[in-house]
Amino acid sequence: MQQKCYYEILNISKTASGVEIKRAYRKLAMKYHPDRNPGDKEAEIKFKEISEAYEILSDDSKRSRYDQFGHAGVNQQSGFGGTGGFEDIFDTFFGGGTSRGSNRSRASRGSDLEYTLEITLEEAFFGVEKEITIPRMESCDSCDGTGSKSRSKTTCHACHGQGTIRRQQGFFAFEQTCPVCNGTGYSITDPCDACYGNGKVKKQKTLKVKIPEGVDNGDRIRLQGEGDSGSNGAMNGDLYVQIIIKEHKIFERRDINLYCEMPISFTKACLGGDIKVPTLDGEVVLKVVPETQTGKVFRLREKGMKSLRGHRRGDLLCKVVVETPVNLSAEQKELLEKFADSLGEDYQSKHAPKSKTWFDNVKDYAKKFFE
């Protein structure tokens, strides 16, 4: 089956910047995250595709190989094998040293794994240690990873222990994985009952992950050696923990700054005064100046997120929303009417500068049609 284009999966162009790639991933990951779509297999598949595309395109080296060679340049499961990039592709078509092919087949690094971890904005603000449980392939204890009950192996008769066989097509010679032993270089006559001759079994592993303060959506934390077990003494793969931050009821995050809307009363907007504003690390008192209008933004410095790339902390920007009183009593309505009368006929010019400007603009606009 033909694999989908990573750029199409993220709905971005091939010239997209790193910021655009991250933004596209964040948007789609939030939409298709399994926790938000329980039991939805299509969403789960879509989320895996999105994560795979982001893993490749967010890495400059992998993206470069993908742009040059397509999926074959980055897919460990392709016919090019491993992580050798262009050299492995070249060797596959034009042949390589026999010893190099043997070494690659005999010792195989474990696969990298990926785990998606959803945390709160508060946890991203303060940092947190999380415990996760992952399924991974580990060396079989019953056969010590040999795949054999007797822990003995027989040299493969087809490749003579090399793990690869050499074929000739016209003028070209190329190597391919031995189909008899699947590249191991040996055969097993008494397969282990626990791992069925694979030398590995799937186990559940519980790990603790330290999340640094300031982590953002789409960030990945690498746990070296916590992926699948390697074969024949090779290194284990790595575990990459991708961070998804839940939406917050009050705050919206943009880079290291936080944003919120702050409702204030009609009287507070007119007269000014102190109000308590919630932040992620406690309440602060904000002084509202008299005659504050809806839309005014107050900046609380260093009340945002910490930068992972330095000691700088972002700001919290609070946008004022003046609330109109509701459920007024007859007495309150009467008082407001008296208040309105007290403003006089020149209300707009003296007491509502924005309204005056708006009406003046409307009049100027209308004149164009009646002059």
Swiss-Prot record:
Q: What is this protein called?
A: Chaperone protein DnaJ
Q: Which GO terms describe its biological process?
A: chaperone cofactor-dependent protein refolding; DNA replication; protein refolding; response to heat
Q: Which PROSITE patterns match?
A: DNAJ_1, DNAJ_2, ZF_CR
Where does this protein hold Zn(2+) 1? 140, 143, 192, 195
Give the cofactors, semicolon-separated: Zn(2+)
This entry's Gene Ontology molecular function terms read: ATP binding; heat shock protein binding; unfolded protein binding; zinc ion binding
Subcellular localization(s) per the UniProt record: Cytoplasm
Xref: CDD domains: DnaJ, DnaJ_C, DnaJ_zf
Principal location: cytoplasm
| Entry note about domains | The J domain is necessary and sufficient to stimulate DnaK ATPase activity. Zinc center 1 plays an important role in the autonomous, DnaK-independent chaperone activity of DnaJ. Zinc center 2 is essential for interaction with DnaK and for DnaJ activity.
* Alphabetized UniProt keyword annotations: Chaperone, Cytoplasm, DNA replication, Metal-binding, Repeat, Stress response, Zinc, Zinc-finger
Residue span(s) of domain J: 5-70
* HAMAP family documented for this protein: DnaJ
